[in-house]
Amino acid sequence: MSLPEFSMRGLLESGAHFGHQAHRWNPKMAPYIFGARNNIHIIDLAQTVPLLHQALKAISDTVARGGRVLFVGTKRQAQEAIADAAQRSAQYYVNSRWLGGMLTNWKTISASIQRLRKLDEILASGAGGLTKKERLMMSRERDKLEKALGGIKDMGGVPDLIFVIDTNKEQLAIQEAERLHIPVAAILDTNCDPDGITYPIPGNDDAGRAISLYCDLIARAALDGISRSQGMGGFDAGELEAPVEDLPPVEGEYEAAPTEIFELLDAPRGAPDDLAKLPGSGPQIVKKLNDAGIFHYWQVAAMTPEDVAKLDHDLKLSGRIERDGWVNQARSLIAS
């Protein structure tokens, strides 16, 4: 097995090149920005490609030496991808909430992990001798600890490298890693601060497809490290995941890429658009859209028929999106 292959086109198709609105940028990210389009910064993927390769090599080398990699991503879009990637590559993860001291106060965290293990044992044995109320309280405590610590309960000590999605949200994790001199590989969107990041990877940290791609590549790099450490002794790590298609490199400017990728957001990027201008919408429907993570015309304009059907079903809009032509109307509002 070798380091996972990827291409600039693959990154483009995942939406990795879309940054935030230009006024929300961090000036320290200027070297990684290609330009702006429709007031959205475009990330320079010509720099992302070699930097991502460097991060993948660092992760593979860390695991090959017997080191541990901790995946960190607690935002909604990243939670599932982070857990799946860590589990596939026999590594560790935090995808719920970063507890203060997870790295710098490992002794206390270890005590909580021991408590989790004890609760698992008691409940697995049937919790004989306990009342129904005691079993219920114990089960709730176990579930709470599992949610917070389940991804690191087998880690056995602080990690040798951490991989982070959204450095703004995971600032506490990065600060703790810095204090312990633990290398950090991180996805850096245009509103992030690259200072203190050992292996910066410029890219969109909100789009679900991009996050899934990053996590898959990191997981496969860790699997490559496992293969190297075991000398491939009958262990075919390549069977554990589907390869990322190696597409031909993209030539020319980024305008050749897809216009937008539909994604849900935790918060608006800058000022939200007036979604009440969409036909048949009103305050209640706008609130439903905002609660679902839709704040801008460009999100609606980027929807595929499958996206329309799913959102209509989830929000119980009775076919309104397609019937009232929201996608075309959103495109018109963007153009006006």
From Swiss-Prot:
Against SUPFAM superfamilies, the record matches this protein to: Ribosomal protein S2
Q: Cite the entry's keywords alphabetically.
A: Ribonucleoprotein, Ribosomal protein
User: Which CDD domains does its entry note?
Assistant: RPS2
Q: Which GO terms describe its cellular component?
A: cytosolic small ribosomal subunit
> What Pfam families does this protein map onto?
Ribosomal_S2
The record ties this protein, via InterPro entries, to: Ribosomal_uS2, Ribosomal_uS2_bac/mit/plastid, Ribosomal_uS2_CS, Ribosomal_uS2_flav_dom_sf
Q: Name one GO biological process term.
A: translation
User: What Gene Ontology terms describe what this protein does at the molecular function level?
Assistant: structural constituent of ribosome
Check the record and name the HAMAP family matching this protein. Ribosomal_uS2_B
Report the family membership: Belongs to the universal ribosomal protein uS2 family.
What name does this protein carry?
Answer: Small ribosomal subunit protein uS2
Native source organism of the sequence: Beijerinckia indica subsp. indica (strain ATCC 9039 / DSM 1715 / NCIMB 8712)
